[in-house]
Amino acid sequence: MRILLSNDDGYLAPGLAALYEALKPIADVTVMAPEQNCSGASNSLTLSRPLSVLRSANGFYYVNGTPTDSVHIALTGMLDHRPDLVVSGINNGQNMGEDTLYSGTVAAATEGIMFGVPAIAFSLVDKDWVHLEDAVRVSAEIVAHYLEQPLPGHPLLNVNIPNLPYDQLGDWQITRLGKRHPSQPVIRQTNPRGEPIYWIGPAGSARDASEGTDFHAVANGHVSITPLQLDLTHTQMLPAARDWARAGSGAS
């Protein structure tokens, strides 16, 4: 089995190195990750300049671009063989609810799906890496289970792991995305020239953390696994939207 491993925290991130070591015994793993931390890069591709791919002393490949660039280059020109699975992470912090739209971690996995390769994104809730090895153990178990018993089609799974010791983690729960309150206001500061500068404010707290959501599962110590899809069509709105379009079209 072959795995393409990427992330959005950069090729030097502890989560990437730890997950690589855990996956080596179960698959042939190639690492292709961004050079720098690209948290919040979402699915951005670099189209305004050429990209360089280098190899570090530990054998990891890295690109001076985004997480999506990393996986795109690997799948369309660098790898000699098509991987059986794209894995992204482990991210330093959660990717739940609307976070998934901003997440470079999820985006790296999404790029695999764009080329028909199943993908799993892993995130460790909280940002202190205290229980990284525990999260790595769970991640490797999920990957091994998928390789032994694949889901139908080309799944995109978003996994969030509570920052807890392994023996305190609950079972794996299949969840839907919860919802957050809007982000907090930007933080305005002044640079040395007296000009205003802005920092993006912290993410909003959970608004829908009801049973069945990723927020609820993680808050109760469970590993959250959310199947995602690329089709953003609001299917329930289609009938009303068609009526609206016909009314407007006829009026003109």
From Swiss-Prot:
A divalent metal cation binds at residues 8-9, 39, 91. Keywords: Cytoplasm, Hydrolase, Metal-binding, Nucleotide-binding. Its main location: cytoplasm. It catalyses: a ribonucleoside 5'-phosphate + H2O = a ribonucleoside + phosphate. It comes from the Bacteria. GO terms for molecular function: 3'-nucleotidase activity; 5'-nucleotidase activity; exopolyphosphatase activity; metal ion binding; nucleotide binding. Its cofactor is a divalent metal cation. Nucleotidase that shows phosphatase activity on nucleoside 5'-monophosphates. This is 5'-nucleotidase SurE. It comes from Paraburkholderia xenovorans (strain LB400). The gene is surE.
